């Protein structure tokens, strides 16, 4: 990896538009989902059994990249509020991480299987395997046959999905604020079998390990009370279905779903390990017995988070839920992941939440559980859980030095969680697709696995049909849907919620500014996602630009907000080459000098038009001055951004430099923008805007 490696990987490199097409897979619906799978931590993989050459390979990619010399411009790495760690600090951290990960002579209480079995055998035997989703999903014969059939159907392009809609909340349709869409895979030519999922809305039916019930005060059924959010997702989560969940508020909602999924993954890790211990004892009694209870490698859970601050909160919650007091390298973890800093109070609350603490987006952390301790910074192949950022893991699985490239440790991941997807999407989201390409592949090397105990669906390359994926996001986007539809194949099906947005709660309804808001629709022939950018550009240059040049209102103060960087480049080049408009442009890659000068010239009216990208707004949240008109080239991905940008006009009016009766907001959209429009104008209005006879709609 050269000096530019990390900088380039953080940069937006738009893949072909077809990559995020909701219908990119034949027969796959846009109702998202997620994939998971379950048991099997290889007890054979012990610290004292690891070979030194394996150790050298695991973090080698991470170490090499961190050591590479590079300079990162603050604008390009989007750290307005937080200083970059120095290169020397990164080198020192990489050295320490490497040394800790591969240190020899580590005492491992987990090796004491006999004591473990004696203490836990009663609990292990008490599990009802016939009813426990853990066993029916990962160890059931019916599930194995179904996975094999789906694997053949996928190869033959005959895999399809059938969906049903479930009401969530009030039985009164006028009061319903949320739907759930449940989709199951089936084979073309066969009659799809889909039934309403069993909703228990409680943890008491899901066989949590006794140690977790004790630690988290869940022994008493009455104390199992869940929040409204948790009641909605507990059943699909514990039944190992894929989940795409859109939540409402930062902080509170994130704490609630993390409380639930940390319990789930701990339960999964413990059951995986206990099953192996149980079968080990059976093999001692009867060596001729056969038990298929393992995968190729030990890591079973992958948690992807946007920043070190998010990772710190997640790992801290895992420690808290586990009840284990001994945590190796806890101080080091706090030093490298915790930061008490907070963004300025003048910034929006959402910005303060996303960018608080340590915003470094480059990390990979192995977490290992033993009977008495949690070991942080553990060797990947000895870890139960891997917590990472998309960039951090991508730099390992796609290392430019093929000798240092590693992805075998992802071969047996059974639960994948993407936390705060909306924030990750503003990084380079293509890293997520890359990571999913490396999940559940058959390893290139043997890593001390006992092949006599590896499940057949691992050997037959069908693990992706057993993996559970859970995605949590502030708002569902086409990219989130695409990731689920293309990369997630869980045989248990997909569960996705759909928030019903009233007109009063929409961005238009809560903007608090009585300004003309005009929505103009353009048509896309065949509703092709691949062709949509061309139709949008043609509409913008032929209709919107002419309105700007022939405006009967203000001849300056027009802000053009462009979500996609590739669209921004295209519009900028057109305005430079084909028009005589005096304009400036600022984007996430602009130097600070350019950012400052263009904003000043625009405020003074010396630049009539200013091009402004969504990623710059996400990472900076500028208070732009001098805005009299706003043009949205495309509806903002985040509905909060719509209100923030429109309110720029209000500030100009307050200063006496504009009149609300003259100022306008114009938004270009097509039928394919339904997801974004729904949050901006409301669910019912979106149906009218996308399918109504008129092509122009106005709100005030």
Curated annotation (Swiss-Prot):
One of the GO biological process terms: maturation of SSU-rRNA from tricistronic rRNA transcript (SSU-rRNA, 5.8S rRNA, LSU-rRNA)
Start-end of Acidic residues biased regions: 82-132
GO cellular-component term (any): small-subunit processome
Keyword field: Nucleus, Ribonucleoprotein, Ribosome biogenesis, rRNA processing
GO MF annotation: an example: U3 snoRNA binding
Residues covered by region (Disordered): 1-139
Superkingdom per UniProt: Eukaryota
Pfam families xref list: Utp25_C (PF06862), UTP25_NTPase-like (PF22916)
UniProt-annotated location(s): Nucleus, Nucleolus
Compositional bias segments (type: Basic and acidic residues): 1-11, 41-57, 67-81
Family statement drawn from the similarity comment of this UniProt entry: Belongs to the UTP25 family.
Quaternary structure annotation from Swiss-Prot or TrEMBL: Component of the ribosomal small subunit (SSU) processome composed of at least 40 protein subunits and snoRNA U3.
Role summary: DEAD-box RNA helicase-like protein required for pre-18S rRNA processing, specifically at sites A0, A1, and A2.
Name of this chain's protein: U3 small nucleolar RNA-associated protein 25
Organism from which the protein derives: Candida glabrata (strain ATCC 2001 / BCRC 20586 / JCM 3761 / NBRC 0622 / NRRL Y-65 / CBS 138)
Name of the gene: UTP25
């Amino acid at each position: 990896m050269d000096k530019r490696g990390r900088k380039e990987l953080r940069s937006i490199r738009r893949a072909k538009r077809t990559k995020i097409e909701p219908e990119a897979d034949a027969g796959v619906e846009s109702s998202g989902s997620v994939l998971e799978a379950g048991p099997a931590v290889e007890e054979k993989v012990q610290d004292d059994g690891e070979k030194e050459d394996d150790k050298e390979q695991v973090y080698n990619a991470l170490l090499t990249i961190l050591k590479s010399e590079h300079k990162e411009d603050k604008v390009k790495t989007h750290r307005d509020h937080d200083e970059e760690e120095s290169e020397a600090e990164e080198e020192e951290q990489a050295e320490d991480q490497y040394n800790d990960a591969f240190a020899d002579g580590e005492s491992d209480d987990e090796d004491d299987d006999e004591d473990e079995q004696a203490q836990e055998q009663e609990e292990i035997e008490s599990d009802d395997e016939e009813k426990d989703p853990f066993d029916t999903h990962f160890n059931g014969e019916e599930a194995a046959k179904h996975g094999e059939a789906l694997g053949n159907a996928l190869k033959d392009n005959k895999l399809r999905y059938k969906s049903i809609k479930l009401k969530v909340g009030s039985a009164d349709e006028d009061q319903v604020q949320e739907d759930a869409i449940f989709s199951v895979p089936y084979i073309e030519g066969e009659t799809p079998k889909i039934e309403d999922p069993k909703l228990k809305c409680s943890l008491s039916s899901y066989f949590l390990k006794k140690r977790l019930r004790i630690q988290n005060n869940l022994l008493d059924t009455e104390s199992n009370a869940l929040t409204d959010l948790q009641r909605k997702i507990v059943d699909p989560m514990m039944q190992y279905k894929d989940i795409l969940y859109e939540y409402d508020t930062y902080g509170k909602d994130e704490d609630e779903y993390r409380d639930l999924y940390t319990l789930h993954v701990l339960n999964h890790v413990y059951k995986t390990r206990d099953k192996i211990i149980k079968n080990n004892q059976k093999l001692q009694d009867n060596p001729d017995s056969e038990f298929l209870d393992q995968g190729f490698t030990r890591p079973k859970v992958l948690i992807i988070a946007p920043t070190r601050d998010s990772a710190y909160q997640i790992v801290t919650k895992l420690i808290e839920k586990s009840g284990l007091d001994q945590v190796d390298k806890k101080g080091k973890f706090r030093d490298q992941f915790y930061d008490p800093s907070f963004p300025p109070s003048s910034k929006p609350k959402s910005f303060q939440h996303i960018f608080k603490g340590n915003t470094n987006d480059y990390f990979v952390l192995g977490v290992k559980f033993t009977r008495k301790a949690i070991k942080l910074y553990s060797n990947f192949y000895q870890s139960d859980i891997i917590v990472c950022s998309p960039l951090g893991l991508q730099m390992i699985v796609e290392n430019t030095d093929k000798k240092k490239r590693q992805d075998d440790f992802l071969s047996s991941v059974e639960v994948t969680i993407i936390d705060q997807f909306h924030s990750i999407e503003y990084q380079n989201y293509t890293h997520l697709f890359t990571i999913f390409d490396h999940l559940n592949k058959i390893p290139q090397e043997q890593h001390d696995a006992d092949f006599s105990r590896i499940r057949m669906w691992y050997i037959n390359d069908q693990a992706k049909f057993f993996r559970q994926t859970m995605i949590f996001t502030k708002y569902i986007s086409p990219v989130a849907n695409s990731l689920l539809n293309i990369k997630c194949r869980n045989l248990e099906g997909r569960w996705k919620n759909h928030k019903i947005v009233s007109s009063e709660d929409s961005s238009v309804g809560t903007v608090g500014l009585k300004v003309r808001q005009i929505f103009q629709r353009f048509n896309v022939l065949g509703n092709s996602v691949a062709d949509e950018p061309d139709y949008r550009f043609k509409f913008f240059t032929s209709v919107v630009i002419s309105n700007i040049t022939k405006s009967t209102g203000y001849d300056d103060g027009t802000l053009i907000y462009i979500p996609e960087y590739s669209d921004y480049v295209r519009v900028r080049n057109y305005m430079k080459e084909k028009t005589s408009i005096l304009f400036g442009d600022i984007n996430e890659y602009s130097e600070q000098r350019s950012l400052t000068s263009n904003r000043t010239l625009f405020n003074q009216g010396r630049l009539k038009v200013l091009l402004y990208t969504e990623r710059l707004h996400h990472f900076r949240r500028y208070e732009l001055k001098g805005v009299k008109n706003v043009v949205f080239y495309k509806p903002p991905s985040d509905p909060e951004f719509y209100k923030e940008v429109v309110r720029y006009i209000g500030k100009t009016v307050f200063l006496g430099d504009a009149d609300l009766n003259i100022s306008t907001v114009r938004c270009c959209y097509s039928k394919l923008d339904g997801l974004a429009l729904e949050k901006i104008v409301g669910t019912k209005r979106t149906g009218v805007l996308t399918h109504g006879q008129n092509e122009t709609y106005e709100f005030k």
